[in-house]
Amino acid sequence: MAKTLYDKLWDDHTVHVEEDGTTLLYIDRHLLHEVTSPQAFEGLKIAERPVWRISANLAVSDHNVPTTDRSEGIADPVSKLQVDTLDANCDSFGITQFKMNDHRQGIVHVIGPEQGATLPGMTVVCGDSHTSTHGAFGALAHGIGTSEVEHVLATQTLLGKKAKNMLVKVEGKLPRGCTAKDIVLAIIGKIGTAGGTGYTIEFAGSAIRDLTMEGRMTVCNMAIEAGARAGLVAVDNVTLEYVKGRPYAPQGVEWDQAVAYWSTLHSDAGASFDQVIELRAEDIRPQVTWGTSPEMVVSIEDRVPDPEKEKDPTRRNAMERALEYMNLQPNVPMESINVDKVFIGSCTNSRIEDMRAAAWVVQKLGRKVASNVKLAMVVPGSGLVKEQAEREGLDKVFKAAGFEWREPGCSMCLAMNADRLEPGERCASTSNRNFEGRQGAGGRTHLVSPAMAAAAAIEGHFVDIRKLG
């Protein structure tokens, strides 16, 4: 019987199935950070349970760490407590951790892949919804809650019910100036933030195959914004070349054995999907969100939508509320919207290719950050990304243009550290969520690609980067 990639991964990790379909899955890799792990470790201590498989775990502090000078530590007492608690718990239980001043430290969904801790065919979980990122490797990856974090630490298994299969095919060649971020925003704009609810999405088609691993990670990262719990891309030579030689990757005979298995990690011909969505890459344009949900997105050449043209009353009300919060008027050209701050970073877009794309735009425009932009910041996803960017001189490009070059961390993606928006400030952001208050109380977030964010910083407003040549 022909199987989808999701079917294969699920079946390969099934330990036991109850009569109602509840399945006990084996978990290969567990990633931890400081926000969702303290209560889980406390539960282990109270029950006097050990960590079942210490080597399956990898931890890092990312949400609360400062992205400015770290020599003076963490100023906020709550943030400091969370980071210190993770340090103490990992030391106590013997779990490998990249602490704040380790040059390998970074965002958990960046360091996992770059260390080779994320491998094809794995089940990967983390107490973070954007664990879907790791599905780019043909791994079944999704976020879990704190009680489940404790369960995985104690048993290396997890209970769940199988989702339905969705295939999203993007065929054709992506136009110049468009990126993986534009692909996934266009997908979400098409199916909505509830379109993937109850599904695991496999992303396929020639436009997906043409993406680098970093691009595929961007797409899978935002599967959760489409309502899905997980996103997947089949394994191919691009996957294998990325993984080979990384610290956690198998070597020698074990590598050959792994590749033999990994090469089977694709949907079989004739495999049945519960739903199929198709897009043409040629139709995708640089995307910008205008509202307070990732599905509220248009191309840069469009105007802010008019709620009066929406027939569905529920959607119309949501649009009206979003426009009020964002302080935007219908029919305003997207290119005329000014920005106050620019954030290039997050687990969606903080890898070396993102840094290069943004730096290229800065060099191409050849000017400094616009006078109306209060802050433009670039936050690498890890210490290794930062080091690579500095070897290439990208930091000098940014700093010369007036951008701030920061230390790695989640930063302004969420208002959980010192990097945040003030009420009423408008931000061009390469992150993944534009909910009310996501980047700070009263802050207004527009999701874009790194190139689009860099251009907005220089021009002071959104621009169509296809015009740059």
Curated annotation (Swiss-Prot):
A Pfam family: Aconitase
Cofactor comment: Binds 1 [4Fe-4S] cluster per subunit.
Broad class of enzyme this protein falls into: lyase
PROSITE patterns: ACONITASE_1 (PS00450), ACONITASE_2 (PS01244)
Cofactor: [4Fe-4S] cluster
Binding site for [4Fe-4S] cluster: 347, 410, 413
One GO molecular-function entry: 3-isopropylmalate dehydratase activity
Catalytic activity, as annotated: (2R,3S)-3-isopropylmalate = (2S)-2-isopropylmalate
Enzyme Commission identifier(s): 4.2.1.33
Tree of life domain: Bacteria
Keyword rRNA-binding attributed: no
Alphabetized SUPFAM superfamilies for the sequence: Aconitase iron-sulfur domain
Gene Ontology biological-process annotations: L-leucine biosynthetic process
Family: Belongs to the aconitase/IPM isomerase family. LeuC type 1 subfamily.
Family matches, as HAMAP family: LeuC_type1
Name of the protein in question: 3-isopropylmalate dehydratase large subunit
